[in-house]
Amino acid sequence: MSRRDDRSDNLICSFCGKSQEEVKKLIAGPTVYICDECIELCNDIIAEESKLEEATGPDVKKLPKPLEIKDVLDEYVIGQKQAKKVLAVAVYNHYKRIEAMTKPGEVEMQKSNILLLGPTGSGKTLLAQTLARILKVPFAMADATNLTEAGYVGEDVENIILNLLQAADYDVERAQKGIIYIDEIDKIARKSDSPSITRDVSGEGVQQALLKIIEGTVASVPPKGGRKHPQQEFLKVDTTNILFICGGAFAGLENIIQQRIGVKTLGFGADVKKKIEKKAGELLIGVTPEDLLKFGFIPEFVGRLPVLASLTELDEEAMVQILKEPKNALVKQYQKLFDMEHVKLKFTDGSLVAIAREALKRKTGARGLRSILENAMLDIMYEIPSQTMVKEVVISEDVIYNKEKPIIVYESVAESA
């Protein structure tokens, strides 16, 4: 293909034939030239094909296997090995089920929505977000404490679907294969395990309202959010293939499990029940649907969340790993910020342990790590951009425990010359 215009000896684009004078940029290859306009057109075509691929949901042939899904989860979430395996298998089977439903005569497979149980800051939300990122599907989050049943002041359950629709850029097809994470689901348990005879606006009533969209229905979603009104146009979204992941700390559930697994003993003067002392996280691993019923969930709601995954409380070692090992680890993020100022940032091992211990003391789990770091780093991040000749900043445990200033290493005159 010609690279020059024979008449004017001008360089031309090998694809559209425009000369270098007609375009902003002409990029040379081994035997051809391509202009900026053709590059932009190619990018548009690739973007459109990518959107089309996402609209149909993950291709089962290209769907990561459970082992591969867990490997990627390991890059972002520390620990929780069993929960990751449960999630990887459940998500893989969910999208295989969608593929099977498109084939006539196939066995009808029930949807496997997921219930995550674990203390605050153990990684429930991060696991759900990472799953959506791996599968390249729209993702939305909702807080169960804000939900009310229809007719009461609060957020309608349909607004959860609206959030997913917004994440999918109002592409209904894409939204219908997305993932919704509902946090604080334990807060909508009714106050006792006996049926309610009065209105429970934020408890059993919300469970009933969530039932339909979780099991699969065509929801009428107001495109602008808020309350429905007769003059408003509705978007129809089928929730049959939306994967729902619900999460909560379930404080007090361990007591119900403890009572169930208590060992009865016989004999004069013996205890009626001998309690087996275990950590709450260890007890949650053995949770059963019956325990959830006693906690305050209605049978139909428990039945719609057949996959149970328990997360354990993070210890000091896990907290330190979270600070430095994941792809998006906080230490790496701060080091990148300092790198942009051409300054090396170093955390001593003692400082990482101090941060972890402070987070454990606050009982906020991994989510408390950032606020501790922000407080410790505020002054130095304020000063460094205005300083010259700074080579390295060292964060020691004294910075965390005693609010001392970080160690600043300056360049020598010889180095700066």
Curated annotation (Swiss-Prot):
Keywords (A to Z) from UniProt: ATP-binding, Chaperone, Metal-binding, Nucleotide-binding, Zinc
Function: ATP-dependent specificity component of the Clp protease. It directs the protease to specific substrates. Can perform chaperone functions in the absence of ClpP.
Annotated Zn(2+) binding sites: C13, C16, C35, C38
Subunit and interaction comment: Component of the ClpX-ClpP complex. Forms a hexameric ring that, in the presence of ATP, binds to fourteen ClpP subunits assembled into a disk-like structure with a central cavity, resembling the structure of eukaryotic proteasomes.
Family, similarity comment: Belongs to the ClpX chaperone family.
Protein name, as recorded: ATP-dependent Clp protease ATP-binding subunit ClpX
Domain ClpX-type ZB: 1-54
GO CC terms of this entry: HslUV protease complex
